[in-house]
Each structure stands twice: as structure tokens, then as C-alpha cells.
């Protein structure tokens, strides 16, 4: 296909805004084939597109050799990329904004979840008479890891109801069987986690949900707008140095997003595509957790336009030293890579 000089200049100019012009005008050769991705709670449905991209070979199709390191929570995964042991994080959208407030420039470049997919509830054993948020005062609340998005939902909920983060004790319980055990055995009074943990605890009768962000409707009501969730993000310096590698990562995640959408009426296919350990020995509960979270998965990897503004409001309520005036939300996300991925894979 021939490209006119005007078209070339337009394309190069648009790419230049992100420092990507060289990637557009050259052959798409990967700058790096080996990519280390850090994630906090890989088996969670929150990160299902990452696992699908891995298990179905989408990363390999792009010429990538991806290694994935799993941590106890998103905050730990973030520390890995900041510390240099990982290149990219599969983590919460708002983490890039929090980093920018500290003078570190990271950018979300492809979306996995368009809702936080987090359920916050109380133990039916320790808090059988729960009636209002005030009952949480002095209680032990389990989150995947302190500072993670599960922690953010707790603090946001507390702030909305006149409580402070210091009114409760936050305890890291991870994102798997350990989290389930912590609630069932009474080590914690409440829990904020994602599926399949939340659905498993609901299914066993151990959890009463008080906040649910697994659907777009509930998410918008709680946060006052779209609140993007799981993304791939990395430093702006990494994007500038490896735009083709970043594009390849986005391609793989967009394909995974679209594959998940195509299986909405075939949850067995999704359950069969993930490692058996994800099922926690209960395939039916895992499929029920998928059903509860289906609305929250991104259909195309595109970040909603109002997502950054919503994240700013959430962080202002969640992080004590976060100053909205010191950040530029437009610099913490881009849809350029996801757009090109959709052009390359319109049907997944």
C-alpha cells in the first residue's frame, strides 16, 4: 500500500507525541524479545487476560519471550518494576498516577479490566450483626497487600462514610487460598479481594458483600465515573526505548481481551484455558466467579477517556499525601498502542 507524503507526516506527527515516530516509519522489529512482567495475584480473574495471552501463545505469536513473576499484591509488583527486577507491570491503572505524584513517570498502555472487579465484605462469623460502615471501626480488614487496589477500595469506602484509614487495621492476606483461610478461620473480620476468592467465600457462606465493583454499573455509582482496573504499564523511558516491544505486548493483551469476550457463553473454555491451580479445586465456583466478573473485562484494551479523572478522585481520598494539583493525568495513559492492536486484530 502506498502512503502519500501528507499521510506520512500526519502519521509521524501523531506518533511523535509519544516519541514513537521511529517505530512507525521503520519495520516493526522488536527492540527487546525478553520481557519480565510483574503481577500481584496472577490467578485472580482481575488478571485473566494476562494469563490467556500467556497460555494461548499470544505473546509468542508477537515474537516475545515473556516471563511472569507473581507477587502477593499489586503494590509488590509495582516495587519490582521500580526496583528494576521487572520491565512491565500487570497492575492497577491508578498505580501509574500514584507514581507520577512521586516524580516517577509510568504509563498505562493497554487495558485488561474496565471495572476494579473487587468485592469488599464482612465475615459472617466475626461480624454476623453487621449493619453499617460504622461497624468496621477497630476491625481487621484483609487486602491482597497494603497499598494495593484492594486497599484503595476499602479506604475509598471508609472515606465516603466518614471513617479514616486509621480506624481499621489493614492486613495483607494475598490473593489465593491463604486469603480464604484468613477469613474462614477468623484471623480477619472483613476482606477486600477479587475473584475467585470473593465468590468462593460467598459460595461457602462465609462472606457478606457490602461493596461490589465487579460490574460497570456498581463501579460508576461508587467512584462517580469509569474506574479502569487491570492494565499493563511501564516507565515512559521503557516505552521510548522499546515502542515496538510495547506494541507487541498490547497486541497480545487485546487478542486475549477479545478471546474472553467471545467465550462469554462458554465459561468452560475459559476454565479449561487457565492452570488447574486457579480453580482452587472447585471448577464450578471458579466459573461462577467468571460469570460475576464478565461485565468488568475490557472488550478491546481501550482505556476510557474519563478514567484518569476518576482515578485522581479515588487517590485523593485514598492516599494522604496525594496532591491532585501536582499530577498531569494525560501523561499516565495512552490508547495509541491499543488502537493499533485493534487495527491489526479486529476480530481477536
Residue ranges and their predicted role:
Residues 1-3:
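Secretory targeting signals
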Residues 239-322:
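Secondary-structure end/capping motifs
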Residues 16, 28-175, 185-195, 206, ...:
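Short, glycine-/small- and polar/acidic-enriched structural segments
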Residues 61, 128, 215-225, 295-304:
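Short, solvent-exposed loop/beta-turn-alpha elements that line the ligand-binding surface or hinge
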Residues 309-348:
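Conserved C-terminal helix/tail region of periplasmic/extracytoplasmic solute-binding proteins
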Residues 48, 54, 76, 80, ...:
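Extracytoplasmic/secreted proteins, especially bacterial periplasmic and envelope-associated proteins
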Residues 7-26:
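N-terminal export signals
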Residues 178-181, 185-276:
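Pocket-lining segment of extracytoplasmic ligand-binding domains
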